[in-house]
UniProtKB/Swiss-Prot annotation:
NCBIfam families: miaB-methiolase, MiaB/RimO family radical SAM methylthiotransferase. Keywords: 4Fe-4S, Cytoplasm, Iron, Iron-sulfur, Metal-binding, S-adenosyl-L-methionine, Transferase, tRNA processing. Its main location: cytoplasm. This is tRNA-2-methylthio-N(6)-dimethylallyladenosine synthase. One of its GO terms (molecular function) is metal ion binding. Monomer. Residues 391-453 form the TRAM domain. Catalyzes the methylthiolation of N6-(dimethylallyl)adenosine (i(6)A), leading to the formation of 2-methylthio-N6-(dimethylallyl)adenosine (ms(2)i(6)A) at position 37 in tRNAs that read codons beginning with uridine. It comes from Clostridium tetani (strain Massachusetts / E88). The gene is miaB. PANTHER family: CDK5 REGULATORY SUBUNIT-ASSOCIATED PROTEIN 1, MITOCHONDRIAL TRNA METHYLTHIOTRANSFERASE CDK5RAP1. Residues 17-135 form the MTTase N-terminal domain. [4Fe-4S] cluster 1 binds at residues 26, 62, 96. Residues 158-388 form the Radical SAM core domain.
């Protein structure tokens, strides 16, 4: 592991200026942006609330779906005018999208005003690239094809002062046929337990109450370490860290979620009763084409085991509609599975062709109108399930970690239960950052309302 690498890259802390980071994509991207922000603040820069006033603009991109890429193109085009007015403006583009073959060159060709392009494997070197861009006055492209060892000691500028992401591993070895992630994030690499523990203890000192352990597939954690450490062992270890009050994790691949992990959640008091368990499809035939390594029966057996051991657990999921070759029968199997599991919530997506993935070349693509029709039906079923689960909370007193003011009503506070339910409630603002009791007075499809007691 490389430690305190940032200090060796760029020691000048007298930089003056502002920066703006726009992030698309998953929680891993969000944490990457927090690290970019941390590095910039470490050398003297400050956040700009408006990108029009920034000296540095960074777009941290996602390529999991086409829509995310289109947003990047549109937003990049809008920066041309800003660059014309302010030639000293530094524009950087990074993230998963840049790891795609030929993408960096295509971006520079279409948007020659971009100053810096870098990928997911070397974001820790951004201060160096920034320095070079200022001195050399020409575009810098630094996209590494292969991942290197994990870099520790990068400063992190976290958005929340209450809860934090803690990455425990990077990359993915699963190669689902629809997914670009293994190609742009590299192979699985686990952080040492001691490094994870150190980061969490530092968060506790700073007043954080909740952490979310992050990885593309957290259940594979530790397989590459010597000696090997299981994810369940890590969970039990983290549960013993004094001061942290809640521990979450995501994302779990169903094929790797062991009984030991289920027992750890059941037995460890700080582990939240919430599991995000992406099913992607309810059809065994489609799951095989997706290369998911489990079938419908396997998944349902796992869900039943989870519910048997953790009675009050909340289960959420991801579902893809319109995977190539999906028939009406396949889709109906997905609907029936959603009804049977009764998810607390679900992220639903239209299948998006990703160049470089095996599914891209499958000829039997589902027509767009059929995909949209199925998507609408799925959302209706999911929403009914969410509403049904939320109604169980009516008149109950639940513990809520107060995260801040409600986005929709400044007179209310907002937070989440250990089952990840969003609660907007009337309460004391002095309790922001604390866990309080809230009586639920109203249930909605996607949130709860209540009063602090």
């Amino acid at each position: 592991m490389l430690n305190n690498i940032v200090n060796t890259i760029h020691s000048d802390k007298n930089q003056k200026g502002t920066f703006f980071i726009e992030t698309w994509g998953c929680q891993m991207n969000e944490e990457d942006s927090e690290k970019l922000s941390g590095m910039l603040k470490n050398i003297g820069y400050k956040n700009a609330e408006d990108k029009n006033q920034a000296d540095i603009i960074i777009f941290n991109t996602c390529c999991v779906r086409e829509n995310a890429e289109l947003k990047v193109y549109g937003n990049l085009g809008a920066l041309k005018g800003l660059k014309s007015k302010n030639p000293n403006l530094i524009i950087a583009v990074c993230g998963c999208m840049m790891q795609q073959e030929g993408m960096a060159e295509a971006i520079i060709k279409k948007y020659p005003f971009v100053d810096i392009i870098f990928g997911t494997h070397n974001s820790y070197k951004f201060p160096e690239y920034l320095n070079r861009a200022k001195q050399e006055g020409k575009s810098i492209i630094e996209v590494w094809d292969k991942e290197e060892e994990i870099v520790e000691g990068i400063p992190v500028d976290r958005k929340s002062s209450t809860k934090a992401f803690v990455t425990i591993m990077y990359g993915c070895n699963n190669f689902c046929t629809y997914c670009i992630v293994p190609y742009v994030r590299g192979r699985e690499r686990s952080r040492e337990v001691s490094d994870i523990e150190k980061e969490i203890k530092e968060l506790v000192k700073s007043g954080y109450k909740e952490i979310t352990l992050l990885g593309q597939n957290v259940n594979s954690y530790g397989k590459d370490l010597e000696p090997k450490v299981s994810f369940a062992e890590l969970l039990r270890h983290v549960n013993e860290i004094e001061g942290i009050e809640r521990v979450r994790f995501m994302t779990s691949h169903p094929k790797d979620l062991t009984e030991d992990v289920i027992y750890a959640i059941k037995e460890c008091d700080k582990l939240c009763n919430h599991i995000h368990l992406p099913v992607q499809s309810g059809s065994s035939r489609i799951l095989k084409k997706m290369n998911r390594y489990y079938n419908r029966e396997d998944y349902l057996n796992l869900v039943n085991k989870i519910k048997e051991e953790i009675p009050n657990v909340a289960i959420t999921t991801d579902i893809i509609v319109g995977f190539p070759g999906e028939t009406e029968e396949d889709f109906n199997e997905t609907l029936e599975l959603v009804k049977e599991v009764e998810y607390d919530s679900a992220f639903t997506f239209l299948y998006s062709k990703r160049k470089g993935t095996p599914a891209y070349d499958i000829e039997e693509q589902v027509p767009e109108d059929v995909k949209h029709d199925r998507f609408k039906k799925l959302v209706e079923v999911v929403n009914k399930s969410c509403e049904k689960n939320n109604k169980k909370y009516q008149d109950r007193i639940v513990k809520v970690l107060v995260e801040g003011e409600s986005k929709n009503d400044k007179n209310k506070l907002s937070g989440r239960t250990d089952t990840a339910k969003l609660v907007n409630f009337i309460g004391n603002k002095d309790n922001i950052g604390k866990i309080v009791d809230v009586k639920i007075t109203k249930t909605l499809s996607f949130s709860l309302e209540g009063e602090e007691v």
